[in-house]
């Protein structure tokens, strides 16, 4: 799991399969079970730590197919959504699109200190909830 560089939605992460796999149907039964556990853990963390009302999960493989010889690698995006603004280090981040689909071109500028705060708080949750 990686914290996305783009924090257009506070806590936005990407889950990446450790081995190469080109699509969801390629997951083993054990990987499906592990994915479910991880989805539950991450979503609970985002709700508990930052107050997310819900999380949108997506497996977007389109970018790989821009290449002449596509070689997709399974990864899943999580975009937490917030009914109430997120407060980080005194800065307020409202989710002005709450209740609507996410914007493809939304800017996610947050300060380096706030990005670090998101990373630390989410990492602490993930390590505590093993």
Label the model's feature ranges.
Residues 1-130:
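HIT superfamily nucleotide-processing domains
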């Amino acid at each position: 799991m990686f914290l996305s560089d783009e924090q257009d939605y506070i806590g936005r992460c990407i889950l990446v399969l450790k081995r190469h796999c080109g699509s969801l149907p390629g997951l083993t039964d054990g990987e499906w079970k592990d994915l479910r556990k991880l989805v539950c853990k991450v979503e609970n963390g985002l709700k508990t730590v930052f107050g997310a009302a819900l999380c949108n999960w997506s497996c977007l493989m389109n970018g790989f197919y821009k290449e002449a010889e596509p070689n997709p690698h399974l990864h899943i995006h999580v975009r937490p959504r917030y009914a109430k603004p997120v407060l980080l280090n005194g800065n307020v981040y409202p989710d002005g699109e709450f209740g609507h689909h996410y914007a493809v071109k939304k800017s996610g500028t947050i300060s380096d200190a706030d990005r670090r705060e998101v990373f630390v708080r989410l990492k602490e949750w993930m390590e505590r909830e093993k």
